[in-house]
Design a protein with these regions (language model features):
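Juxtamembrane helix-boundary/capping and inter-helix hinge elements in multi-pass membrane proteins
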Residues: 32-38, 101, 160
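Membrane-spanning alpha-helical segments of multipass transporters and channels
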Residues: 60, 70-191
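Selective transmembrane-helix segments that form parts of the transport pathway or gating/packing helices
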Residues: 35-62, 79, 83, 168, ...
Length: 191
């Protein structure tokens, strides 16, 4: 559930926020400021990192105290590895904002083209081992797959970085790729 909540909030909100600025014309005003493109991107995405971390802490609190789910691992490690997951969701959100022109398109594209397939291919609903081999290969490109393993490892097994490093490395690689691609497309749309 945590992976889906963060995917929903931290992917859809930034994409809609950037597209809204395109729609109302404030993005053009921001472009003429002396900010470097990377500064603009960080400024646009930083609030959503904070929102994602607040969501993480709220969901963890609800899981522990309302539903009695034990947190056997490190909360600090969970927060740090969640930052890697947020890198992925923010990259996707920024990428979506470069592909669409309206907020409605951003929401629909994010929900139906990205989010639904990612959830089905992550192993959250159907075990990856039960999927056809070709689809199993595709799941290696799905960030939710790795974050779900991280959540299960930290919450249920008390796993540390010694066990979770392959998932963390995958999130870092995919997230860097997504954010780089999205930043390049965003810069081209600014030029």
């Amino acid at each position: 559930v945590l992976a889906m909540v963060l995917l929903l909030v931290v992917m859809i909100l930034p994409s809609m926020a950037v597209v809204r600025e395109k729609e109302i014309g404030t993005l053009e005003q921001i472009i003429v400021t002396p900010l470097a493109p990377w500064q603009l991107i960080i400024g646009k995405l930083a609030p959503f990192v904070a929102i994602g971390l607040i969501d993480l802490l709220l969901a963890t609190g609800v899981a522990r105290w309302l539903f009695g789910v034990p947190l056997r691992g490190s909360l600090t490690l969970l927060v740090l590895l969640t930052l890697l997951y947020l890198l992925n969701t923010l990259g996707l959100g920024l990428l979506v904002s470069t592909l669409v022109n309206t907020q409605q398109q951003a929401m629909m594209f994010s929900a139906f083209v990205i989010m639904v397939p990612m959830i089905y291919l992550s192993g959250l609903i159907f075990p990856i081992e039960n999927m056809p081999h070709a689809i199993q290969i595709v799941t290696y490109a799905v960030p939710v797959r790795y974050y779900a393993n991280i959540i299960r490892g930290i919450f249920l097994r008390g796993s540390g970085l010694a066990v979770l490093w392959p998932d963390a490395l995958a999130l870092l690689g995919i997230g860097t790729l997504l954010l780089t691609l999205a930043s390049r497309r965003f810069r081209k749309s600014l030029d």
